[in-house]
């Protein structure tokens, strides 16, 4: 049974793209069939998987120009990629006039979903039409949360949006899990945020936490996931552990 997971948080800088790239690669390394759909116009997940951002076909062409989804997918050693590009930045405006505009991504992924065990969608850091498409296409959401004061405020906005989507567009949308990122267990703030997140989401919070790690920050500039850049660092260990926990929940 295929599963589509949107990795989403409208707050930027929380490790969303880092999580999408590294979780997808780690799950692929466990023998699963994986597609990463880069739905962020910054296209950082595309380059993070080793794919050139200037690729001729991508998710924009699928949504706006009717390109077949399979023809836009690129295979990499870390999993397949449906790439993004700067052109996607204007797609929200172009989609406004289109019929069933909130379901365009769902229709695109339906063409290939049976070919994969898991499809991970890297969402833009906002709650507009692109993200709405991801929420309508997904079976579940994975929410990265940084250990800082404003993190909980952003979660409240996201959950309000999820309630609206469930009510009228995707009633079965589930919370896959909540992931604490850039976590520093030496600080009271990180510990307090973790306690609040666990109080709110309970068992949905992964026991795996992603630490602050320089090697994680370096890996994108080397256009590869952390497990291919430095398998022996703390960041790689964390994402491998997350993949194991993720797969155990989905066994």
Residue ranges and their predicted role:
Residues 1-251:
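P-loop NTP-binding core
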């Amino acid at each position: 049974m295929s599963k589509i997971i949107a990795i989403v948080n409208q707050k930027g800088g929380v490790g969303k793209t880092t999580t999408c790239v590294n979780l997808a690669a780690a799950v692929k390394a466990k023998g699963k069939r994986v597609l990463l759909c880069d739905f962020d116009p910054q296209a950082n997940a595309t380059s993070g998987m080793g794919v050139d951002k200037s690729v001729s076909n991508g998710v924009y062409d699928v949504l706006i120009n009717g390109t077949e989804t399979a023809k836009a997918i690129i295979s990499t050693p870390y999993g397949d990629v449906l790439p993004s590009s700067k052109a996607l930045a204007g797609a929200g405006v172009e989609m406004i006039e289109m019929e069933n505009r909130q379901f365009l991504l769902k229709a695109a992924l339906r063409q290939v979903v049976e070919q994969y065990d898991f499809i991970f969608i890297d969402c833009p850091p906002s709650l507009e039409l692109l993200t709405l498409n991801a929420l309508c296409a997904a079976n579940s959401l994975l929410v990265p949360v940084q250990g800082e004061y404003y993190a909980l405020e952003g979660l409240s906005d996201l959950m309000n949006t999820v309630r609206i989507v469930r009510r009228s567009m995707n009633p079965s949308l589930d919370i896959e899990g909540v992931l604490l990122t850039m976590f520093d267990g030496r600080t009271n703030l990180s510990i307090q945020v973790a306690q609040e997140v666990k109080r709110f989401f309970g068992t949905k919070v992964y026991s795996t936490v992603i630490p602050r790690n320089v090697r994680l920050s370096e890996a994108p500039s080397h256009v590869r996931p952390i497990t291919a850049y430095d398998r022996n660092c703390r960041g790689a260990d964390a994402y491998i552990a997350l993949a194991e926990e993720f797969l155990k929940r989905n066994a």
